[in-house]
Amino acid sequence: MVVKHVMDAAKKEGADHKILTTGSHDAKKNPLTPEQKVKHLSRAVKGSHVEAMTKEHPTLLHQMSKLHKAGYTHVTMHVGSDRVHEFHKLLHQYNGTENKHGHYNFKSIKVKSVGGERKEGGGGIESASGTAMRKHVTAGDKESFHKMAPSGMSKAHKDELYHDVRKGMGVNESFIVRFKNWIS
């Protein structure tokens, strides 16, 4: 799980960690509210420091300015392997510049991959993605959703997360039946 990976990497370096979730919320790609994202991630991994992006600091660049203002001089960001180059370029492009996001000037910025390549279709945490988990919710496949959820989560917590995603997507039983009939 990404959160555990970040916590372990920070501990190894003797550094603080912060998990940032997007502040966006919509039925299609972000069915959980920012508050629900923080609640579920914090409960899933004890000791994690999870925050949602806010109206005051809505983007990654705003968050970098906030960290710089708080006195941090080095930043290491952990992302999926497919996003390393993109974030490396973005963060370095604005380092030392004043812009609408504010200002940051870190001595070092590292962007690292969280583990290896994602294993599509594996069914477990290695193949977990928000897209795949939302598909399981749409199909009413709670068992597959549970397999992709962090192993440290209790069944009750996985059920609560499943319900929250389902509600956020506007999925109800009649929709699931129609969807299953459509794909059959």
What do these predicted ranges mean?
Residues 1-183:
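Nucleotidyltransferase catalytic core that binds NTPs
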